[in-house]
Amino acid sequence: MLLHLCSVKNLYQNRFLGLAAMASPSRNSQSRRRCKEPLRYSYNPDQFHNIDIRNGAHDAITIPRSTSDTDLVTSDSRSTLMVSSSYYSIGHSQDLVIHWDIKEEVDAGDWIGMYLIGEVSSENFLDYKNRGVNGSHRGQIIWKIDASSYFVESETKICFKYYHGVSGALRATTPSVTVKNSAAPIFKGIGSEETAQSQGSRRLISFSLSDFQAMGLKKGMFFNPDPYLKISIQPGKHSIFPALPHHGQERRSTIIGNTVNPIWQAEHFSFVSLPTDVLEIEVKDKFAKSRPIIKRFLGKLSMPVQRLLERHAIGDRVVSYTLGRRLPTDHVSGQLQFRFEITSSIHADDEEISLSAEPESSAETQDSIMNSMVGNSNGEPSGDATEFCKDAKPESPSEGNGVNSSENQNQEHAGPVEEAAGAMEARDGSNVSEAPEEPGELQDPEQHDTQPTLSAEEVAEGLPLDEDSPSSLLPEENTALGSKVEEETVPENGAREEEMQKGKDEEEEEEDVSTLEQGEPGLELRVSVRKKSRPCSLPVSELETVIASACGDAETPRTHYIRIHTLLHSMPSAQRGSTTEEEDGLEEESTLKESSEKDGLSEVDTIAADPQSMEDGESDGATLCMAPSDCSGGHFSSLSKGIGAGQDGEAHPSTGSESDSSPQQGADHSCEGCDASCCSPSCYSTSCYSSSCYSSSCYSSSCYNGNNRFASHTRFSSVDSAKISESTVFSSQEDEEEENSAFESVPDSVQSPELDPESTNGAGPWQDELAAPGGNAARSTEGLESPMAGPSNRREGECPILHNSQPISQLPSLRPEHHHYPTIDEPLPPNWEARIDSHGRVFYVDHINRTTTWQRPSMAPTPDGMIRSGSVHQMEQLNRRYQNIQRTMATERAEEDSGNQNSEQIPDGGGGGGGGSDSEAESSQSSLDLRREGSLSPVNSQKVTLLLQSPAVKFITNPEFFTVLHANYSAYRVFTSSTCLKHMILKVRRDARNFERYQHNRDLVNFINMFADTRLELPRGWEIKTDHQGKSFFVDHNSRATTFIDPRIPLQNGRLPNHLTHRQHLQRLRSYSAGEASEVSRNRGASLLARPGHSLIAAIRSQHQHESLPLAYNDKIVAFLRQPNIFEMLQERQPSLARNHTLREKIHYIRTEGNHGLDKLSCDADLVILLSLFEEEIMSYVPLQSAFHPGYSFSPRCSPCSSPQNSPGLQRASARAPSPYRRDFEAKLRNFYRKLEAKGFGQGPGKIKLIIRRDHLLEGTFNQVMAYSRKELQRNKLYITFVGEEGLDYSGPSREFFFLLSQELFNPYYGLFEYSANDTYTVQISPMSAFVENYLEWFRFSGRILGLALIHQYLLDAFFTRPFYKGLLKLPCDLSDLEYLDEEFHQSLQWMKDNNITDILDLTFTVNEEVFGQVTERELKSGGANTQVTEKNKKEYIERMVKWRVERGVVQQTEALLRGFYEVVDSRLVSVFDARELELVIAGTAEIDLNDWRNNTEYRGGYHDGHLVIRWFWAAVERFNNEQRLRLLQFVTGTSSVPYEGFAALRGSNGLRRFCIEKWGKITSLPRAHTCFNRLDLPPYPSYSMLYEKLLTAVEETSTFGLE
C-alpha cells in the first residue's frame, strides 16, 4: 500500500509537471538561430539600486511624457496613463483604477497591458484588458490583480501600457507599481548536483500526420491567401525538458493557391517525439504572387504531443482545433483539421546527452518530500523539504576539467548505475542512471577549442564518450533509433543550407532559418546547436517512468493513458475539487474555442516575429544560467504551496490564477479529457514552475556558444503553463472581445539579468574560481544558500555556475536599445525624459537645451549650452557638406570669392560651441560607461571596469578601429566575409560591456589576434602560458584574468600606429570645409590663438604634433598633387595659376612621372612657392584609395572620376552625350545662386541682425525673425551675434546658428515634426502637431528659416522625407511617395495598379476616416459613394487615395510652411530643382566613404563580395562622381543622408537595415530599389558596360525609387 501511495504521488507530481510545462508554444529559438537575430533582455527592477523605493518615502507619482508635447511651455496636454496607487498588496488592497487621457488617435480596439518592469515586447504581457468600444480619449478601468505565478516574490514591480489597436503604437505608460504578495513562499536552494536526472526509459513515439485541411482562413485585403503549413517539434516550454537531437524537426507543406479552405490531401509527415514535446503548426501565406505583404501570419496551433496521444487513446484519429493568434490585435480565423496516427509503439529513447549524476537516494528522498508536502496544509515548505535541500548535497563536489570530471563520475558510479538500470522498472520511478556527459554541456567557452566535441553520429547511435561508460546503459534499439534520428536530421540541415544560399527576402525573415557555419558538417552542427546550458534540469523522463512503473509492462497506448486518467482522478486533491460535472462540461466547451489571443503564448520563445525586435542586433537577449536553487526542490515547494493553498483558503484568499474580472474563471483550469475533479484550482492554481525556482538565478547575456549561435533558454511561469497545458486551442477573437476579459499570457520569459541582492545568499569562492586559467568552471556548490529575505552576503551580480553551465565573469550591461521602452525605474538625469514616437521607438528629450537624441543620457551634469552645440561628429559632417557645396561652386566662383575668403575667420564654434576633440569625446564616453555602472555593487563595478580596460575592448571601441582594420588586408577580408563577426564587433562598439558575451568566441579571438604584433614584449603584468594541448593563452596578473586574446594589439595608448597616423590626421582635418582648412595656413595667428581650447584644428594639432609621419616628403607631394581636383584646390589660394600654363604643365608632369619628375623640378621657384602654401595639407594627406585597397594602383592617365574624393561639379562621369532628361545639378546650383544674387536676394544694404542667446535659441529666433517683413527677409544681409560672445560674423556664427537651430526646430521635441517611418534620421511633418499651441505660426517660421538658409547659402543639419521636399516645390505626390508613410498601404495600391481587378475588388471612391475616435466615411470625389472602382478608373482612384493619405492631417501645416518659405524665396527660382536636388541644396552633399559603404553592404540571392557582378558594381560606383553616388544612395535608401556613425547605422522601416544588393530580374531590366529595406535589386548583367549603363540610367533618369 505504501509502495502504491508513493507511486501515485510520483505519478501525480510528474503529471502535474509534464502537463503544466510541455503544453506550450514552440521554442522558436531552437530553430531560429540567425546571427543577427535579436534576443531580448528582461530586466527586473530590483537590479537598480539608484532609487530606494522599499525603504524611502513614497514620492508623488510623476507623469511620464508621451509621444507628443502639445504645448511649447507647459506639459498639460500630453497623453497620460495613470494608476490609482503605486503600491498594491494582493488580497488586501482595493482594486487598481487605471485612468487614461490620450491625445493621439484612439481606436475602439485599443488595449491596456500589464507588464513586468523593463519588458520591451508588447506580446509578453501578464494580463490585458480592452479599453472598451466607446472610442473616447479619456476613461478609466478597474483592474484586480490576483495571486499568480507572476507574483511569487514578496515584491514585484509592474507597469501598465496603453497600446493603439490599429497601429500597435505605444501611447502611454504608467509609473511602476509595486505588487506585494505576503503569501509568497521562501524556498531553500538545492545543491547543483541534485539537478541530476534519472535517465530512466524515455519514450520516443513515432507518429504521422496527414489529411490536413483548414477551414475559414483569414482573407487578405483584396485577395485570398496562398496558405502553407510549417510543422515542427519543439521541446516542452520549461527548461526541465532539455533540447534533444530530435527537436527542431521541421516540415513544410506544399502551397495551396488562392483559397481560404485549403486541403493538403497527399501530404504525409512523420515525426519522432517525446510525449512532453510540443507539436507546433503554423499556417502562413506564402505571398507567391505580386501582391502586397499585409501580414503573412494566418494562425498557429501549439499542441502537446501528450494531448494528441490522449485523443488517440480514446479513439480519436482525426482532430480539429481552432487556430490561435499571437497578439490581442491579431485577426485570426479558421480551424485546422488533421489525422494523427501512432506508427510505432512507445519505446526507450537513446538520448545520452543530458547529465545524470543523481545519487541513488535522490529519488527516494523525493518520495519522502512528496509525502511531507501532500500532508502539509500551509503554503510554506515543510521541514522535510528543507532538510532535503540541505542533506542532498554531495559531500565532495567535483571540480576541474569538465571531461575529466565526467570520466571520474562515470567510473565512480558504474556499479550502482548498472544495478539501477537493471531494476529500472521495479523501483516506482526512482531511477538512477549514469549517462556519458556531453562535453558541450560541461566545457566552458574557453575550453571549446580544447575539448573534444560529441559528433552527431555518436549522439545518434548512443555511443559513449569514453570507454569506461557502462555499455549496459544503451538499450538494444538505440542503433536503430539513432539511424532514424540521423535520417531525420540530414535532410533538414541540407534544406536549410540551401535556403541560406538562395537568400531570402524580407518576408522570409520571419521564417526559422538557421545560419549554418561554413565548413562544419551539418550533423555536427545540429548537435552543437543543442549544446546549451540546462542548469536546472529535472528528470525529463520521470513522467514516463513513473507511469510505466504504475501501469505495468504490457500495455497499449490506449490503456496506458486511460490508466493515467484513473490514477489522476483518484488523487486526494482531485477529489477535493469543487468543480461540478456541469461546470466541467462548460469548461471543455470553452476550451475548444478559448481565445486565440493566447496564441501570443504560442510563441514560446520570446523572440517573436516582431520586425522591430529583429535586426541588428539591436535587441539583446539573455541566456539563463541557473543558480543553485535546484528546480527539484523548487517544484516540490511550489507544489506544496499549491496544495496547501487549496486546503487553506483563509490563509490565501486568492489562490487561483484567473482574474475576477474575467467571466471564465473556471475555464482557465479545464483539463481536456479529464473530469472536473482534476481541474480544481487547487491543482493548477500555483505551478511547480513558479519563478520562485529562479529567485537566485543569474543570467548571462546571450551566452555565445562555440558555433556562433545564440543560446537562449526560455523560462515561463506556472499559470500560463497550466492553462496552455489544458488546451492550446483558444476561443475565437469575437468571444474574447465580447467578454472583455483579462487573460494571462506568456510572462517575462527571461528574468532579470542581475540578481536581486535580497533574493540571493551565496558564497564568495565562485568569483575567484571563475577566472581560473583555462576557463575551468568551478563545480563546487558549497556555501550556496537559498534565496531568503534579509541581508545578502553574496556580492551582487555574481552567479553560481553549475557543472553544465557556461561561466561568466560579470553580468552584461543593461544599456537599453533605443527602439525599446526604457526601464522605468532606472532614473534619467534631471530635466530629461524618454518619449516614444509613433513607431514605438524611444528617444530622449533634454528639456534644458530642448533637444532630442537617440542615445540614453548619462547622469553627469553638463554645463548648459555644451550639449546644444551638437555632437562633434554631426558638426564635422555638416562641415564636410559645406566643403562639397563650396567645391561645387568653386569652378565658377574661384576668382570672385578669393578676395572675400581672405577676410573670413575660422569659426570658433560661435564661442566654443562646436569645438571639442575626439579625446574629449572618448573620455566623455568612458565616463558615461562608468556612470552607467552606478547600479552595480562596488565589487562588480570594479570587475566591469577591469574588463572595459582590457586591450581587446580598447582596440575594438577605439574610434580608429576601422582605420586599422582597412590597413590589415587579411583581417579586412575575414571581417567582410563573416556576418556574425560584424555583428559582434558592432555590438561591442556600441556598448563595450557586450564584449563579456563574446570574449570567448573563437572567431572573435582569432580575428583580434590577427592584429597582434608578436615581436613586441608583453605589457607589464602579463604572462604567456601554454595549456596541455599546446595552445597559448595569456594571464593578466593585474586583473587576475586569463584570455586567449593577445594583448599586443594596436590602439592601446589611444593612438594609431605610426604608419596610419597621417590617415587619422587627414580625416579629422578634412572634416572642416576647404575654406576653413585654408585659414590654417593663412591665419596662423589671430583666430587659432583666440580660443585654442575649443578649436578642432588646434586640438588635432596639439594631439598629433609629436607623431612621426612615415612617408617621405616627396612621396606626400606626389600623392597630394595626384588628386583629381587638385587644380581647383590650387586655384583657390593662387588664382593666377589659371593663367600660368607653364606651372600647370609642371604640376601635370609631376602627376604623371611621380618622384622622378619632382626631383627634376625641385629647384623651380614658382613650384616651390606654390607648394609652400599647402604645407599642412601635404603633410596630412594620404590617397585613401591606395591605402584602403592595396591591390589598386593609381594611374594619372585614367579617368579622373575613379577617385572616391571626386566632388560634384568638377568632373563628368560619362563621356556620352547627356540625355534629354539628365539633370545637371552643378549647373542648376550655380545658376540658382547667380540669379539670387542678380535679383538682390540677401545682398543688402540693410542687415537682419539677430542677437541670439544660446539658452533661448529657438524662442529668441522666432520672435525676431517673425518680426521682420517679407521684403526685409528677402533683401537684407544676415548678421548673427551670440550674446556675451565677441567676434564678427564672417559666416562662422551664422553657420553654427543654422546648425543649432535646425537641430532644435526640426527634431520632435516640440511635436512639430516626427521621425519618419523609414529610419531615425529623416523627419516629416507630424499630424499630431495640430495639438501644439500656435502651431501654424511655428510652421510659417520653419518655412522662413528654410528660405533664409537657402538664399544665404547655409546648410541645415536636418534631412526630410521626399514628400516634404515635393511639398516645398508644390509638386504632386505619386504612389512611390506613399512608401514613406504607410508601407502596407503603398503595396496594396501598387498591387491594384499592377493587376487586373475586374470582379475581384468591391470598392467605391470612399475612404473611412477616424476623427477623435469616431469613424466616418469620406468621399474621394463628388458622388464617390456610388462610384465603383473598375479597371478603367482605378488610376484615378489610386491618385485620389494617394493624395488623401499623404495630406491627411498635415494640410494646414504644409500650407503654413510653404507660406513662410515663399515669403523669403522666389518660387520660380526654386522650381528648377526636383525633390532630390532640393535635398542636396538644403542639407548639403556629403563625401561618401566608398570603403565604409562596401564594408557595410549585404548580399542576397547568390551575390557575394567577390562575385563578378558585384565587383563590376563597385567599380561603377567608384567611377561615379560624388553627386552620382549621392543619387544612387537616394535611389536605394530614399535620402542622401548617411548617419554620422556611417553606413553601419543605416536604418530601414523596422530598425537597422544595411545597404543590400540582391540578385533579381532579367538582364534586360533596370535595377530596382526598395527604399523601405535599403535594398537594390540588381540583375546579373553579362558585362561591365551594360551594368554601368543600366545603373546610371536607373539613378539619373528615373523619377521614382521603386522602378518596376
Curated annotation (Swiss-Prot):
C2 domain sequence ranges: 182-318
Gene assigned in the entry: Hecw1
Lineage summary: Eukaryota, Metazoa, Chordata, Craniata, Vertebrata
Domain WW: 826-859, 1016-1049
Comp. bias intervals (Basic and acidic residues): 387-396, 494-505, 590-601
Pfam families: C2, HECT, HECW1_helix, HECW_N, WW
Complex and partners: Interacts with DVL1 and SSR3.
Biased composition range(s): Acidic residues: 435-444, 458-469, 580-589
Reactions catalysed, as given in the entry: S-ubiquitinyl-[E2 ubiquitin-conjugating enzyme]-L-cysteine + [acceptor protein]-L-lysine = [E2 ubiquitin-conjugating enzyme]-L-cysteine + N(6)-ubiquitinyl-[acceptor protein]-L-lysine
Swiss-Prot/TrEMBL GO biological process terms: protein ubiquitination
Entry keyword Coiled coil: yes
InterPro entries found in the cross-reference section: C2_dom (IPR000008), C2_domain_sf (IPR035892), C2_HECW (IPR037795), E3_ubiq-protein_ligase (IPR050409), HECT_dom (IPR000569), Hect_E3_ubiquitin_ligase (IPR035983), HECW1_helix (IPR040524), HECW_N (IPR032348)
Protein name: E3 ubiquitin-protein ligase HECW1
Residue numbers carrying Phosphoserine: S871, S935, S937
EC number(s) reported in the record: 2.3.2.26
Keyword presence, Disulfide bond: no
